[in-house]
Amino acid sequence: MEEPICYDTQKLLDDLSNLKVQEADNERPWSPEKTEIARVKVVKFLRSTQKIPAKHFIQIWEPLHSNICFVYSNTFLAEAAFTAENLPGLLFWRLDLDWTIEEPGNSLKILTQLSSVVQDSETLHRLSANKLRTSSKFGPVSIHFIITDWINMYEVALKDATTAIESPFTHARIGMLESAIAALTQHKFAIIYDMPFVQEGIRVLTQYAGWLLPFNVMWNQIQNSSLTPLTRALFIICMIDEYLTETPVHSISELFADTVNLIKDEAFVSIEEAVTNPRTVHESRISSALAYRDPYVFETSPGMLARRLRLDNGIWESNLLSLSTPGIHIEALLHLLNSDPEAETTSGSNVAEHTRGIWEKVQASTSPSMLISTLAESGFTRFSCKLLRRFIAHHTLAGFIHGSVVADEHITDFQQTLGCLALVGGLAYQLVETYAPTTEYVLTYTRTVNETEKRYETLLPALGLPPGGLGQIMRRCFAPRPLIESIQATRVILLNEISHAEARETTYFKQTHNQSSGALLPQAGQSAVREAVLTWFDLRMDSRWGITPPVDVGMTPPICVDPPATGLEAVMITEALKIAYPTEYNRSSVFVEPSFVPYIIATSTLDALSATIALSFDTRGIQQALSILQWARDYGSGTVPNADGYRTKLSALITILEPFTRTHPPVLLPSHVSTIDSLICELHRTVGIAVDLLPQHVRPLVPDRPSITNSVFLATLYYDELYGRWTRLDKTSQALVENFTSNALVVSRYMLMLQKFFACRFYPTPDLQAVGICNPKVERDEQFGVWRLNDLADAVGHIVGTIQGIRTQMRVGISSLRTIMADASSALRECENLMTKTSTSAIGPLFSTMASRYARFTQDQMDILMRVDKLTTGENIPGLANVEIFLNRWERIATACRHATAVPSAESIATVCNELRRGLKNIQEDRVNAPTSYMSHARNLEDHKAAVSFVMDSRQQFIVDSGPQMGAVLTSQCNIGTWENVNATFLHDNVKITTTVRDVISEAPTLIIGQRWLRPDEILSNVDLRLGVPGNTSGSDP
């Protein structure tokens, strides 16, 4: 596809070529009329903001520079001199270079080629032949030298970054990117700092190597011998997951294996618990890597027994983890947050204390490297912050009911601190790979911080952050820091170059003309080149960098109120009547009269204003408006002063409208609307002042102050912005609704599967740690399988956890939906305000229709919010209260059993019995209260086998050893195949046997503590006595 050409540049070349062809009889210098035409053409180019593709740059350079030099040799205009001497810099300022992260070297080759083109021998010869300087700051020699030096430095930075990326363990270092950017933006490159190719180059380099900063911090922690082996191993896993997943590094695998060998066995759970699958994918990934001693193992192979890393709170007390890095074992930290939210235990208080210290360091950070180092060194990596943010959002937003929450009841100080770390960390990792002194980063920073504050606007108050508190913390570290001094220095250099050109023109006029010749000497401070260049650059400073340019009173003098000299009024009226679009400017002596300025403004600017406000705000209408606005701006710009800044206002309006004529126009925002409206009203005010200074009988009719009631342009402008805003809100809302719908369907499916799963029949097996599941329909003798009880509870807990995770996502989505509703309500108020203003005009229905659309939209969002709230409000999942009760009971029993196994004692065994007794009692009560219709409905559903497979997922079935055909279970303690001929009556002598399991549980304290249990040797002695074995007479009554 052929590259588009720059219209303004090509138009300048064509116009100058036509002037060159029209030269007759070697007329030198050119006539004043022809000179003025050339001045206007060059000035129009100097004001241009259009971009120049690289291919067009090469094609146009030689003929354009040649024609400008030719114009100067025939006119000696300051505009031509400035442009000829500084054309390389002016073109590089407008260069449209497509930088890519994949191949930045291609852009450097193009830059090298362009910098060589502008400094070829023919260019230097043309300048010297016309007595123009080759040493100007933006001229061929200077620009070639600076850009070549910058390219060389960029290549070094790119090579260092590439080497560091390819070999990060040996070549990457903290601060290397900052040093490279500082070198590329040092003072000697100040004059090219604002040029787009420099800005884009820095942006690409930052995105290319910005991730090396957190990587280096993690690598330093891995080599930190003061950290425990488990902590270092977890850092290795995290570093690989975030940065090295594609290419395994052998040396890191060896380092990981050596580190894992140093981890104490007590860091892992017992073998009995290890058979239970981990609850999360991340926990499975960590445990698998540690079990296989390979950081590139992401899951345990089926049938393989793997060690499982501990998550309990005790891991924080056993010197297994370094407390200075609480975020690196994120699963244990989340478990601690869930089990000890108040940080009341020893583990919780220790971790909370270190966490508060980390938060204080984060708040005291003043640069990106300080903030990222603090977070990464503490284990709060990108992934850790993401999980923490999700956890805190779930536990906090669960308390919100229709936008209100009692924060103290739902989040503790410990959770608040970690929530703040998660939010700040997420923002920091998002910004670190784009942080640079570029205009792009200014937009990225503003958009990212604003979007985050809107997304979590209901969460931030609960975290203790005041309005704007998150942005304040980020500003200290990541606020845009453009090099304002470089931009201001560039403006000074431009002024110096303009002064050189003006001095040369003034000298020429003084040498070749005298007062009687009628020559029009340029007035100091009012030259067209000064006005055009500074207007262009000052608008650029303001719009791109937010820098307010210095006020130059000489460039914007007030409109002259003095009456014209005797006899000139009629001449001025006659000349003013000739001014009409699209006539060319014809130089006349009356144009230099200060009292003629009101006539110029009252004709050209009034025509442009009247035409613009009558057009429609669409591509064709904007193009037509730009044509007449540019004509009004350029008419008489060589001699007519910029009174009241009218040309500056026209230039600003042109600059903001021009992008909307492109193939891919920018999004029309409220800021655009207010700026355009303000500029049009300012022009109307200036025109009104000028018209009031004209004689009464020649005053043109000035339209009323432009507004949506009398201006088609403004009415369609406001309507298009409101419609575009509604389109964006609707699109975002639809994406949220689709997400809500898909999540609700997933939750519904999971709940149906659980309903079918618990409707199945569960039967005991010889192994008391396993249970069988079969079809609930009695007529179908269909067994689905046998699983360990631990696996069953873990599978159900995983499903419930997945549903809770989906609800958390939906809660975050609700925050976004509330933001959309607030924006829609604001737009609705604007629509109603505009509808009121236009109620009696023809365009009234436009805004009433838009107001109705916003009203329906807002109501729809409210309906969606109320429906989604039903699923997300509260801690418990609607419809799954019984499942969560089951999981809580199971967790209490399992915890008691684990404690009794680890620390056997009478008290721990009694606790197990009490938990079992309470569980059985609760089950009996549940059976009495359970609705029979519900269970009957669930049992009559189909595909129970699919539900069991879905819930149990890939968990291995338990193989029950059925033993011999007689049913006896043979073990190392029992080798009896049949009990028919065995006399076991002696086992009942002097022994009290409880008849039922319920009695055992109810009498457990008495049986365990109050009764004496038979010892094995006493039982054996009794057996020997019965058998008549001599020598064994010991024994006693129980």
UniProtKB/Swiss-Prot annotation:
Q: Name one GO cellular component term.
A: host cell Golgi apparatus
Localization per record: Virion tegument; Host cytoplasm; Host nucleus; Host Golgi apparatus, Host trans-Golgi network
Alphabetically ordered keywords of this record: Host cytoplasm, Host Golgi apparatus, Host nucleus, Virion, Virion tegument
Nucleotide-binding recorded as keyword: no
Which segments carry the region annotation Interaction with large tegument protein? Answer: 545-1038
What is a biological process (GO) this protein takes part in?
A: virion assembly
Please indicate which superkingdom the organism of origin belongs to. Viruses
Record-linked InterPro entries: Herpes_UL37, HSV_ITP
Report the function annotation for this chain.
Answer: Plays an essential role in cytoplasmic secondary envelopment during viral egress. Interacts with the capsid via the large tegument protein/LTP and participates in its transport to the host trans-Golgi network (TGN) where secondary envelopment occurs. Modulates tegumentation and capsid accumulation at the viral assembly complex.
Q: Which family does it belong to?
A: Belongs to the herpesviridae inner tegument protein family.
Q: How does it assemble?
A: Interacts (via C-terminus) with the large tegument protein/LTP (via N-terminus).
Descriptive protein name: Inner tegument protein
Organism, as annotated: Varicella-zoster virus (strain Dumas) (HHV-3)
The gene coding this protein: 21
